[in-house]
Design a protein with these regions (language model features):
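ABC-family P-loop ATPase nucleotide-binding domains
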Residues: 71, 80-136
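The feature captures the beta-strand-to-loop junction immediately N-terminal to the Walker
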Residues: 31-36
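Helix-to-loop junction immediately C-terminal to a conserved catalytic motif
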Residues: 49
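Catalytic Walker B motif of ABC-type/P-loop ATPase nucleotide-binding domains
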Residues: 149-153, 158
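C-terminal coupling/interaction segments
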Residues: 240-283
Length: 283
């Protein structure tokens, strides 16, 4: 079972927000939808969840038009930064609604998450901080039984401890009920360890769809005195170079060579690769 997105486009008047995105979302996987702010991530997710209408393109689940199949749409859940919840509802009210809407909603897991995130269920949604609004949304998403859970910038406003806890509890949610989680974010480093695959979107176009393990094998980072680094990379494929004073750091495509005096070699990270392929020419 998979969701296939083909040549998906969204146009607002004369502006193309999404310019023909094509990718696959496999079942029972944890996928990162990566892109800089304004790249089109949220627009893509909103079209899949049909919160906004697509201009053109196809979104299918096992070959069937997702939007024409009510049963299939029930398997898609989007948690976004938009405030869709009634502002005067308390979190306990939202839990009760979800239990009715989704009969298989994992209330036990939700209660466990409420404890570990220290959520006051009697607090009105409108009175919660940005961070705790995000936590409420995380709990409702992780306890949701839908087969495809889309999380759009889920850790907005969370501190470092809560962001780490989110990763841990997402993996726990997956272990309890294997299904697909798609995390749309521009904060790569903290989610990189839990992703199996990444889809990179730049300026409304999907530029990469690749397994994380394949990304990490693509290259490496070399750093050191500028003259030494420049000499070393002269005959190599360099993805990106940063220079500060006499110190240079280059992202190189290929296998790491033998150690050389004065140079430091380190593995390529997902964040290194993402920054390199999404950086604009004038940066």
């Amino acid at each position: 079972m998979s969701i296939e997105v083909k040549d998906l486009k969204k146009k607002y008047f004369k502006k193309e927000a999404v310019k023909g995105a094509t990718f696959t979302i496999e079942s029972e996987s944890i996928i990162g939808l990566l892109g800089r702010n304004g790249a089109g991530k949220s627009t893509v997710l909103n079209m899949i969840a049909r919160r906004i209408e697509k201009t053109s393109g196809d979104i299918t689940l096992d070959g069937v038009d997702l939007h024409k199949n009510p049963n299939a749409m029930h398997e898609v859940y989007l948690s976004s930064s938009d405030n869709w919840f009634p502002q005067e509802y308390k979190f306990k009210d939202l839990l009760a609604i979800y239990k009715v809407t989704y009969p298989e909603f994992d209330m036990k897991f939700a209660q466990d998450l409420i404890k570990v995130f220290d959520v006051n269920v009697k607090q009105k949604y409108s009175k919660a901080s940005t961070g705790y609004k995000s936590i409420m949304k995380i709990i409702l998403a992780l306890a949701n039984p839908s087969e495809y859970i889309f999380l759009d910038e889920p850790v907005l406003g969370l501190d470092a401890n809560h962001r780490q806890l989110f990763n841990k509890k997402l993996l726990e949610a997956y272990a309890r009920r294997p299904r697909t989680f798609v995390i749309a974010t521009h904060l790569i480093e903290e989610v990189a360890s839990i992703l199996e695959k990444v889809i990179v979107i730049k300026d409304g176009v999907v530029t990469e769809e690749v397994l994380v393990e394949d990304v990490l094998r693509k290259g490496y980072v070399v750093s050191g005195a500028s003259t030494l680094v420049q000499e070393y990379v002269a005959d190599k494929k360099v993805l990106e170079t940063d220079q500060i004073g006499n110190f240079t750091r280059s992202v190189v495509i290929g296998a790491i060579g033998e150690a050389q005096p004065g140079l430091e070699f380190s593995p390529l990270t997902l964040q290194d690769y993402f920054i390199s392929i999404t950086r604009k020419e004038n940066e």
